[in-house]
């Protein structure tokens, strides 16, 4: 009986060519797995393609709700944004894909897992760290890093497929390299490879339009959160995945969430990409607006710092680590009272605050108002400032004694 290998399969040219390559070079029975995180139409005809290329079977694992509830929500609660821009759409999906690959490998009794991530990117790290953490005994085959992999272009991959009786309508023409799930879609390649070039948004965008082409009239949206988790949109209770889907429609319509970023990859190089994250951008902004009202100053500052660390951890593929569990435990503690309603207006790429309420709001109008109130005496500030500024005053006095001008 042949040994089995589980292949992370997308249906694209790379992973399609890997099926006969695995059979030819390793004599494996190939079991394909496609993990559906919300790729939409990209799944059409996938099973027929995998079987036609020599796979013994294809698993399509629908994990959209698990992805949103167990991976997206923690990142939203953390305010996890990599290098101030990237909302981690690809990064946070990879550990879940790795988890499902391992589950199928165990079910099938497979001895190896194969992926088609390139040797220059981050995904090879994310997949392999996940597999190593969950199944250290399973062999990992990275096709693009394997000495037996000789294909180096779309043309050579197409020719290899044809030589093995696989005739599919793949084009040798270059196109954008894209990754899509319910949270985002990324675009790399073509004119984007030169940072001096402006993106061809008319040809590139999938989920929405540029702000210039958005409607002239804004649209109001109301979102409710309970303990940092979105629970309803415009008064309608929804599960998280449905909220994200609806926000994608609204955000795309109004030109929200398009970023052009040069990011620092884990492997050391810089890469340029355009990301569309309309729903995610709205959700992150709404959550932050609510936190501004509820968290005290020290907790807000520490959580912001932790959010940056959490983003780096997710970006680097370290989801299945004790550190992620510890950081997430801290973040969840901060979310106990992040409950309330956020109203905002979407208008030509902007998310404009239109009102925030919470039963746990720390904003007290009688204290914050410029008018006289009972809870705060303006004279109290004098003693506070004298103490708060004492070190400044002492330093200045000492420098004056020594005839030193510091500023």
Give the role of each language-model region.
Residues 2-407:
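Nucleotide-activated chemistry modules centered on ATP-dependent adenylation/adenylyltransferase
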């Amino acid at each position: 009986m042949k040994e089995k290998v589980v292949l992370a399969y997308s249906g694209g040219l790379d992973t399609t060519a890997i099926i006969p390559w695995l059979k030819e070079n390793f004599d494996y029975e190939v079991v394909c797995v496609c993990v559906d995180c919300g790729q939409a139409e990209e799944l059409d005809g996938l099973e027929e393609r995998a079987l036609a290329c020599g796979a013994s079977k294809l698993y399509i694992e629908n994990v959209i709700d698990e992805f949103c509830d167990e991976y997206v929500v923690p990142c939203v609660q953390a305010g996890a944004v990599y290098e101030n821009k990237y909302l981690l759409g690809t990064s946070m999906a990879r550990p879940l894909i790795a988890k499902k690959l391992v589950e199928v490998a165990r079910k099938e009794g497979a001895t190896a897992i194969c992926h088609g991530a390139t040797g220059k990117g981050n995904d090879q790290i994310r997949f392999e760290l996940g597999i190593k953490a969950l199944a250290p005994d399973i062999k990992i085959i990275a096709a693009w890093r394997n000495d037996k992999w000789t294909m180096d272009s779309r043309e050579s991959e197409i020719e290899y497929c044809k030589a093995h009786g696989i005739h599919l309508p793949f084009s040798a023409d270059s196109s954008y390299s894209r990754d899509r799930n319910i949270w985002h879609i990324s675009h790399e390649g073509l004119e984007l490879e030169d940072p001096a070039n402006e993106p061809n948004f008319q040809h590139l965008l999938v989920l929405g339009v540029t702000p210039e082409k958005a409607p002239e009239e804004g649209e109001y949206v109301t979102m409710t959160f309970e303990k940092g988790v979105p629970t309803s949109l415009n008064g309608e209770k929804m599960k998280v995945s449905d909220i994200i889907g609806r926000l994608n429609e609204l955000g795309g319509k109004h030109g929200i969430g398009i970023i052009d970023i040069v990011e620092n990859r884990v492997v050391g190089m810089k890469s340029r990409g355009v990301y569309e994250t309309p729903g995610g951008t709205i959700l992150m902004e709404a959550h932050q607006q609510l936190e501004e009202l509820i968290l005290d100053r020290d907790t807000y500052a520490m959580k912001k710092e932790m959010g940056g660390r959490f983003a780096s951890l997710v970006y680097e593929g370290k989801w299945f680590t004790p550190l992620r569990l510890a950081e997430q435990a801290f973040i969840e503690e901060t979310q106990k009272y992040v409950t309330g309603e956020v109203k905002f207006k979407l208008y030509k790429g902007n998310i404009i605050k239109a009102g925030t309420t919470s039963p746990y709001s720390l904003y007290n109008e009688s204290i914050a108002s410029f008018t006289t109130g009972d809870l705060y005496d303006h004279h109290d500030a004098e003693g506070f400032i004298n103490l708060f500024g004492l070190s400044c005053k002492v330093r200045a006095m000492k420098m004056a004694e020594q005839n030193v001008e510091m500023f």
